[in-house]
Structure formats: structure tokens, C-alpha cells
């Protein structure tokens, strides 16, 4: 089976994140099973136009918007047996350019995020996502990562029976994780791309209200300068930027509570990464998928809109010991192998051998 994966970025892109990691892990699993996998994405300065990694062939062309225009040519050249069209706000509309099966991968809907793009692009983007895409993909197979995201799709008119939930996996903790100096302080941590809809400002505010707490901000993004300015005079905040996997896990191992004040999450891979170390997460229930990745009161706290995020953080710190083992057991349920197996089963149902 030849599989074409369409996504606007890959994990080597400076703005790559959990959505890209998900698709790459699925592609790697398919390649391990003997399938031919092509990952088509945008070009960027840190990567060649063509490369191969872990059995997956990467093809890069186009930029932030023109990557969508390059997709039809990629479909024609590769002639895949099945296409996975990743909808990060808007899809590639691959179904218009091939008669082969197309699976639409949607991590979450972007209604709350489109306003950041400005009034014109925001309204156009939401129109394409909420009105046009459901019509083009009517009757197609959807894959999403949580019950919350499935509910959002159903609200847009997608039939519930067309939607398969394939949850995120998680990478194993590296065999060698460095030990960090124990300064005997309370360490709060946020692990995220630094963009407006992640609302890192609320994590900064929460940490500032807890005496002696340090907030470790792990991740990078174009909003970083704004966050650094906001953090001035608001407690002890350390910006680590993009870090290696071992160092990321060292920071998680030292953390007491993980803060995820994001406006919208399809699942929240960082929730499970923190749970691997027995670190509970505080997040907003309204963010969507975190209501599935966090077991409220057991592996973390789900805060309702209007509630005090800092107070929930303080309460979670007091209950951290009882939540730690629950979080570790919960994290053991998730693996990329299981994610890949379930996604492969969806594709197998659609592809008829030639």
C-alpha cells in the first residue's frame, strides 16, 4: 500500500508541534509494516526538499499558504492508494483531486484560534473549516484524537459514524535523563509552542501567586518576545527555549505541576509526557481534548472558565503525592505503536488491493 500524508509542517519545522509528531509516528509505523509512505509538507530553511527518516520519504514544497497549492501535483505524481489529509484549520481538499480513498485527520476545530489571524483571514478560515470542508468530505472517513474533538466535528455536520477516534501515543522516557540540581523550590512547568492561543500568560500569573515558585517555560515560538516582556516583574520565570528530549524529560522529572492554560487542544501530548513522571496537569476543561487526556481529580485538574487557575494549581500542589502514581499508571496506557496500529486498521478498511 502506498500512503501519501499531507501536512502543512513536519517536526523539523521551527513551528512544528504535536500534530506533526502524530502524523510522523503513524507514518513510521506504516513504513515498519512494509508500506510505502510519502510525507508531503512545506519547505523551510532547516531541511532539504527531499529526505528520508525512519522509513518515511519527505517531500517539501511551498510555504505557509502555497503548500496547499502544491498538494494536487504531489497526488498526481505519487499516485497513492490512500491519502491522509491533515486539517490544521483547513484541509488540503485532497478529495477533489483523486478518486482514491482520503482520510481527513483533524486534531481539533479552530474556531477559537482563527481570530488571531485577523478579521478577514479569520472569517475566511473558519468558513472553509466549518462550512466548505464538511461538504467536500461528506461521507469520507475522519480520524480525530478525542471525544471532545469528535463532538466538535459532529456539531459541524459530520456524521458521528464517519469519525474514528485514534488517540495520541507518547514516546518512551529516554534511557539516560540528566539529573538537575535540586534547589528545593516549587517548580511549575509549561511545555508548549509559544503562540497566543496557548495562553502562557495565565501560567505566568498562576506561578507569580504561589510564594517561592519557579515557572519553567519549555518550548519556542514567535510569541516568545511578548511573553518575556509580560513576565518582567511577575515572579521567577525561566525560558528554556527548544530543548533536547533528554533535557525536556529532566525538566519534567523535576517539575511539581504541569500547567496547560491553552485555549484549545485536540488531546495534549504534553499532558501524558508529564504524567510519565508522575506530574499532574492543570488545564481548562473548555480546551476540549484535555478533558479526555486528564482524569479530573486523579491525574490532574480541569478548571472551568472563570475559576481561579492559580488556586487550582495550589490545590494540585497539595495533592501531588496522591496524584503522582495515578498519573504514571494512566501514561502507561498510551504508545505510538498502538496509535499506528489503530490508524493502519482505518486505512486497511478503505483500500481495496489493485
Name each model-derived stretch.
Residues 263:
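Aromatic "clamp/platform" in nucleotide-sugar-dependent glycosyltransferases that forms part
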Residues 285, 295-307, 314-319:
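Conserved acidic donor-binding segment of nucleotide-sugar-dependent glycosyltransferases
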Residues 148, 169:
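Carbohydrate-associated surface elements
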Residues 143, 177-210, 216:
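Conserved donor-binding/catalytic core segment of Leloir-type glycosyltransferases
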Residues 225-246:
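Nucleotide-activated donor-binding/catalytic signature segment of Leloir-type glycosyltransferases, i.e.
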Residues 121-142:
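Membrane-proximal helix-turn-helix segments that form the acceptor-binding/catalytic region
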Residues 280-284:
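Short hydrophobic beta-strand element within catalytic cores of glycosyltransferases
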Residues 321-334:
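A short, well-ordered alpha-helix in the C-terminal region of glycosyltransferases
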